[in-house]
């Protein structure tokens, strides 16, 4: 997949990742497997696949998207969300084995992160493994009760619940202080596009935006009329 460090935000990768990146660049023949994350340069942990097809650690891509204005840290393609779990990769990792680069112990790839956290040779060389901070808030899909990152909810609903018509409460409204989630009971996808969208240009129907604006203008006019009537 390549080893690409994200520096647009001015925030550096963990020290251990930086050290390994410099070492790999000095040795161009060192192979980088498809199980390496291009952000932290370690074996994948909870792999997710982005819309552009690249696979990263879940916490790495979530943090990278927040810091780099929603672009893929590998190919710079626009991404509306962190992607979906790469279950095929996770399954393969459970049956693949690799020698630890530092102590040469044969380790299952799905357990490699746990191994290097305690590998003394790794710690002596790079310091303790540092995971990128995971800052995205989490919510629960009201249709299937799956726990998601808030930025993945729209993608998830479009993919799995496009035909749903039953009224539900918006889980993102519950995350906003002083917001009343009981005030919403319409199409969740439309509501997310209109009320909770910052970078979902590919999914936006501008007719929906126009409807929402007209509705807001009418609501404001009605409120002004009621207030005026009460004062006269």
UniProtKB/Swiss-Prot annotation:
It holds the Pfam family zf-Di19. A lipid is attached at residue 2 (N-myristoyl glycine). Changing residue 2 to A: Abolishes ability to regulate T-cell activation but not E3 ligase activity in vitro. Also abolishes myristoylation and membrane localization. Zn(2+) 3 binds at residues 100, 103, 115, 119. GO terms for biological process: adaptive immune response; cellular response to leukemia inhibitory factor; negative regulation of RIG-I signaling pathway; negative regulation of type I interferon production; protein polyubiquitination; ubiquitin-dependent protein catabolic process. InterPro entries: Di19_Zn-bd, RNF_E3_ubiq-protein_ligase, ZF_C2HC_RNF, Znf_RING, Znf_RING/FYVE/PHD, Znf_RING_CS. Residues 1-10 have a biased composition (Polar residues). GO terms for molecular function: p53 binding; ubiquitin conjugating enzyme binding; ubiquitin protein ligase activity; zinc ion binding. Pathway: Protein modification; protein ubiquitination. Residues 43-45 are annotated as: Interaction with the C2HC RNF-type zinc finger. A zinc finger (C2HC RNF-type) spans 100-119. Induction: Down-regulated by miR-15b. Down-regulated in BRAFi resistant melanomas, leading to increased levels of JAK1 and possibly promoting BRAFi resistance. It is linked to Tenorio syndrome: A disease characterized by overgrowth, macrocephaly, and intellectual disability. Some patients may have mild hydrocephaly, hypoglycemia, and inflammatory diseases resembling Sjogren syndrome. PANTHER family: E3 UBIQUITIN-PROTEIN LIGASE RNF125, ZINC FINGER, RING/FYVE/PHD-TYPE. This is E3 ubiquitin-protein ligase RNF125. It comes from Homo sapiens. The gene is RNF125.
């Amino acid at each position: 997949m390549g080893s690409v460090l994200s520096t647009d935000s001015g925030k550096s990768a963990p020290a251990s990742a930086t050290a390994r990146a410099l070492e790999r660049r000095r040795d161009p023949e060192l192979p980088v497997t498809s199980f390496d994350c291009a952000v932290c340069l370690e074996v994948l942990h909870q792999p997710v696949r982005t819309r552009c097809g690249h696979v990263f650690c879940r916490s790495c891509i979530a943090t990278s998207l927040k810091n780099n204005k929603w672009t893929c840290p590998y190919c710079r393609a626009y991404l509306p969300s962190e992607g979906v779990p790469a279950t095929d990769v996770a399954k393969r990792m459970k049956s693949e084995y690799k020698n630890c680069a530092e102590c040469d112990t044969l380790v299952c790839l799905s357990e490699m992160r746990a191994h290097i956290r305690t590998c003394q040779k790794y710690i002596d060389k790079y310091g303790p493994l540092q995971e990128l901070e995971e800052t995205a808030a989490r919510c629960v899909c009201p249709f299937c009760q799956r726990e998601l990152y808030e930025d993945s909810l729209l993608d998830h609903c479009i993919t799995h619940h496009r035909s749903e018509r039953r009224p539900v409460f918006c889980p993102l409204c519950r995350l906003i202080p002083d917001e009343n989630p009981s005030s919403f009971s319409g199409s969740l996808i439309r509501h997310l596009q209109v009320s909770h969208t910052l970078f979902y240009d590919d999914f936006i129907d501008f007719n929906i935006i126009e409807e929402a604006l007209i509705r807001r203008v009418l609501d404001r006019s009605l409120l002004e009329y009621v207030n005026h009537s009460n004062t006269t």
